[in-house]
Amino acid sequence: MTDLTTSDSLQPAWQTRDHLDDPVIGELSNRFGPEAFVVQATRTGMPVVWVKREQLLEVMSFLRKQPKPYVMLFDLHGVDERLRTHSQGLPDADFSVFYHLLSIERNRDIMLKVALSEKDLHVSTATKIFPNANWYERETWEMFGITFDGHPHLTRIMMPQSWEGHPLRKDYPARATEFDPYVLTKQKEDLEMESLTFKPEDWGMKRGTENEDFMFLNLGPNHPSSHGAFRIVLQLDGEEIIDCVPDVGYHHRGAEKMGERQSWHSYIPYTDRIEYLGGCVNEMPYVLAVEKLAGIVVPDRVNTIRVMLSELFRINSHLLYISTFIQDVGAMTPVFFAFTDRQKVYDVIEAITGFRMHPAWFRIGGVAHDLPRGWERLLRDFLDWMPKRLDSYVKAALQNSILKGRSVGVAAYNAKEALEWGVTGAGLRATGVEFDVRKWRPYSGYENFDFEVPVGNNGDCYDRVMLKVEELRQSLRILEQCYKNMPEGPFKADHPLTTPPPKERTLQHIETLITHFLQVSWGPVMPANESFQMIEATKGINSYYLTSDGSTMSYRTRIRTPSYAHLQQIPSVIRGSLVSDLIVYLGSIDFVMSDVDR
């Protein structure tokens, strides 16, 4: 197991570092020579290395094959660099592509960047090294117009096939009022419907064999078992799945584009909608990344309050997941019990934040307000109620022989496959990999809590759902510690960029009154830099990679969600299985389409 004391997460959050002392920089220099790279100093907590386009695949292969390899392509996307003013010391670039690699054995990350000219937006595909680069490269091409040479199927993934332009370019409008009014004529509707017709040849599929034709079946985008606006086209021989093509993007809302026109403060409500069951869990990585940019260290009370709200939302999400999984297998009753239990969670959340699903309650430098009187009683009542209810779910449903017969050994994959496809959360831990960000890279004071990380052995549907049950128990354990050990102190940091600033000062000092007005109306100005924060969200690892150009809003907001990677893995897991197995597999993934499509 990796020595957690070596993790960069224990370094001061405000520290800008080039990470030249990281062993991987020495390894790269020894292999390729120090002149082959430009190392960028950031607040991401990892080495950020610009490499030559011609050497990119060689560098990635080298890192992939090291004794302690970088086994996961955690993220891949682009940046339009043309309007960036604070880029001194970096390679000249109109656009750039970044590759975020993760090593489990080292418990470390590295980010590779490639500079591109607007006249030559080409880079080689990484799909032969990391198969999960497929969807990320498709999205990067779609959003920026960067071509990945050798990609097996470089087509649109988020936007309709008829869409024109590349939305994340800086010269692409960010507001609907900048477009002509949209009119859907009958002719245009027919063309849009025709574009959705699945053509097997486009995906390298055969329509049949010499003796019989294959059936092509649309599951979704309005099927109850697809868990949202998600379409998956199945190639069937009888009920056996020969192959399938997931089709996403129906829930895309341009969340990353919105980050470029909202202030650092006013973007917080948008984070709640990324994974709409996660509530405050979604806000955590964003505010932590902004606080790294600002150099804010929050009081212990803020850390503990944030942990408490995050674990309440984790329980709320897990309850829905467990009960709907049971429903997908065929048992209806547990869903109704779960909504009773979730209401008790919402009672606590609503009393504290004033809202239920989308509280937008975390703030830059703190939380919106202090805990209300009586929060302890509400939390105590829930902690006394929930353990016995959880036992009843296990006894009445999850130990049922029919449920186990439908899920044990179904849609199983191993640790190597999970890492290759970017699987995180319970989906990865079900294969025996004990990687939980709260333990391995503690944030918001998680290092002060006593809890276990449940792991599985088989990597199948049953392991995944039972891990969620055990995670729910550990969340209750964390909440018990919040109840008993809530620190005293302020609910906001004493820092100039805390937003909004403490209200009590605004009527005493003209300086703070002006600051309050500017930060609420225009937004705080963050120092030019880059920051990154990953957290253990309800469905896997969620992260924000923020680029500030010294303005009141983000220059580039990259949101990496777990569900996107998990859906891309589906074909590799389900080929050769039955349609009924796919239904159970989809239920075991734990995804919502807002998390996929952003």
Swiss-Prot record:
**Catalytic activity line of the entry:** a quinone + NADH + 5 H(+)(in) = a quinol + NAD(+) + 4 H(+)(out)
Does this UniProt record's set of keywords contain Transmembrane?
no
Task: Cite the residue spans of the region called NADH dehydrogenase I subunit D.
Answer: 213-598
Q: Which GO terms describe its cellular component?
A: NADH dehydrogenase complex; plasma membrane
The UniProt keywords, alphabetically, are: Cell inner membrane, Cell membrane, Membrane, Multifunctional enzyme, NAD, Quinone, Translocase, Transport, Ubiquinone
PROSITE patterns to which the protein is assigned, alphabetical: COMPLEX1_49K
Q: What is its EC number?
A: 7.1.1.-
Keyword GTP-binding appears in the UniProt entry:
no
Q: How does it sit in the membrane?
A: Peripheral membrane protein
* GO MF entries: NAD binding; NADH dehydrogenase (ubiquinone) activity; NADH:ubiquinone reductase (non-electrogenic) activity; quinone binding
Give the residues annotated as coiled coil. none
The EC class name is translocase
- Location, primary (coarse class): membrane
Q: Which domain of life is it from?
A: Bacteria
Subcellular localization? Cell inner membrane
Q: Using the UniProt annotation, give all residue ranges assigned to the region (NADH dehydrogenase I subunit C).
A: 1-189
Fill in the subunit field for this protein: NDH-1 is composed of 13 different subunits. Subunits NuoB, CD, E, F, and G constitute the peripheral sector of the complex.
- Database matches in HAMAP family: NDH1_NuoC (MF_01357), NDH1_NuoCD_1 (MF_01359), NDH1_NuoD (MF_01358)
What family name appears in the similarity comment? In the N-terminal section; belongs to the complex I 30 kDa subunit family.
This chain's function reads:
NDH-1 shuttles electrons from NADH, via FMN and iron-sulfur (Fe-S) centers, to quinones in the respiratory chain. The immediate electron acceptor for the enzyme in this species is believed to be ubiquinone. Couples the redox reaction to proton translocation (for every two electrons transferred, four hydrogen ions are translocated across the cytoplasmic membrane), and thus conserves the redox energy in a proton gradient.
Mind telling me what this protein is named? NADH-quinone oxidoreductase subunit C/D
Gene that this sequence comes from: nuoC
